[in-house]
Regions:
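Terminal amphipathic alpha-helical/low-complexity segments used for targeting or macromolecular assembly
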Residues: 1-76, 116, 126, 268-269, ...
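Domain-scale recognition of functional cores that engage charged ligands
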Residues: 58-86, 96-320
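Glycine-rich N-terminal segment of FAD-binding domains in flavoprotein oxidoreductases
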Residues: 89
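Glycine-rich phosphate/pyrophosphate-binding loop regions near the starts of catalytic domains
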Residues: 93
């Protein structure tokens, strides 16, 4: 596909944010042929729940395992060997078109203000500057940069996820008001763009050996020494946090033909009862930095979206599918309370509902 096939403004965005025309043409051909469809989302093979030993609980405070993890995590954080990566991309559609990271979350501070401020406070307590990297998108980059510039935090490293174009069900370019409709193709871009942008090399140059990845809207996913320590003690290159379901739907650890990894909701066969899996993915993870210095073969999922009252096709990939390529620890964490790690805010109503829980959690120090 030639960028000349789209309007000038969209073409500039595509060029700036890493549009891969060759890959796009290959993928749209697969949509047109039916090779990529809602049906292709479903994995082949025998799907079963994880074995009990596949999910490891975060150690209880005061236990020997807790002390071991706390000591290991504290040492790594104090030595500057752990960095934070915040996923601040997406399409900025759920808060009235405002970039979510800049929205006030609690007590006059934005999501980014809390997220970066908590990391800065931990670094101050430990006498170290903890590196932070922000992954934005074409829809959030300018607003996020402007907002962070006004915060009293250390300047983060910046990189962006890529950009793509929505399709019709027949594989043609989907248009809005006569223009090609662009979107951000999922946080799976993290695994490619952290390398391609030079961010991975920059983190390595600062002595970083592990990165903690979390959504900008989940203030519970703080850098906690015990969680970092659990990742280190496991000796595995990837740790994915899961939480007990409370009516939640979404991705979860599963076994496919005996292999353990994380499946997204649409990947489960219709006949499989997802309630057989008691935990779900919180989209928070830790990686050994060296494990990210490679290419990943992530699946593309077909997602149908209503855009301007019409159905559009988006192709998205997800970073937690790296669990099929890297040996992974599935770590069950508390979702609420002072050590709670799952406070997702997807809509404004979620924010109103969660404020007291957030206040309780944020008032507790991860060092206690």
């Amino acid at each position: 596909m030639s960028l000349g096939a789209v309007d000038e403004g969209t073409a500039e965005l595509l060029e700036r944010f890493g549009f891969d025309a060759e890959e796009f043409d290959e993928l749209r051909a697969q949509v047109a042929s039916g090779a990529l469809s809602a049906a292709s989302n479903v994995v082949s093979g025998v799907v079963g729940p994880p074995a009990p030993e596949d999910v490891v609980a975060l150690p209880e405070p005061g236990s020997d395992a807790w002390r071991e993890g706390h000591e290991a995590g504290l040492e790594a954080l104090a030595a500057g060997r752990v960095a934070q990566v915040v996923l601040a991309g997406g399409m900025a559609t759920r808060f009235g078109g405002v970039v979510k990271g800049v929205v006030e979350a609690l007590d006059g501070r934005s999501f980014l203000g809390w997220k970066l401020g908590e990391t800065g406070r931990l670094g101050t307590d430990l006498g170290v500057r903890i590196p932070v990297a922000l992954m934005t998108s074409f829809a959030t980059d300018a607003g996020t940069r402007a907002h962070v510039a006004g915060l009293e935090v250390d300047e983060p490293l910046w990189f962006s996820q890529r950009i793509s174009l929505r399709l019709t069900g027949e594989g043609q370019i989907f248009e809005e008001e006569g223009r090609a409709s662009a979107y951000a193709p999922g946080h799976g871009d993290l695994l490619e763009t952290i390398r391609a942008s030079g961010t991975l090399a920059a983190l390595r140059g600062r002595g970083v050996e592990h990165v903690a990845v979390s959504n900008v809207d989940n203030l519970g996913a703080r850098l906690d020494p015990v969680v970092v320590g659990a990742h280190l003690v496991s000796g595995r290159p990837m740790t994915t946090e899961v939480a007990r379901k409370e009516g939640d739907m979404g991705g979860a650890p599963a076994r496919v033909d005996g292999r353990l990894g994380l499946l997204e909701g649409p990947e489960f066969p219709a006949h499989f009862d997802q309630d057989r899996i008691p935990v779900f993915n919180t989209n928070t993870a830790l990686f050994a930095l060296d494990a990210l210095d490679r290419a990943f073969d992530l699946r593309w999922l077909v997602v149908r979206k209503s855009v301007g009252g019409r159905e559009a096709v988006q192709l998205e990939h997800l970073y937690h599918h790296a669990s099929w390529e890297l040996e992974t620890t599935f770590l069950e964490v508390p979702r609420s309370g002072p050590r709670g790690r799952f406070f997702p805010i997807k809509e404004p109503v979620d924010l109103e509902r969660s404020r007291e829980g957030l206040r309780e959690m944020l008032s507790a120090s991860v060092l206690d």
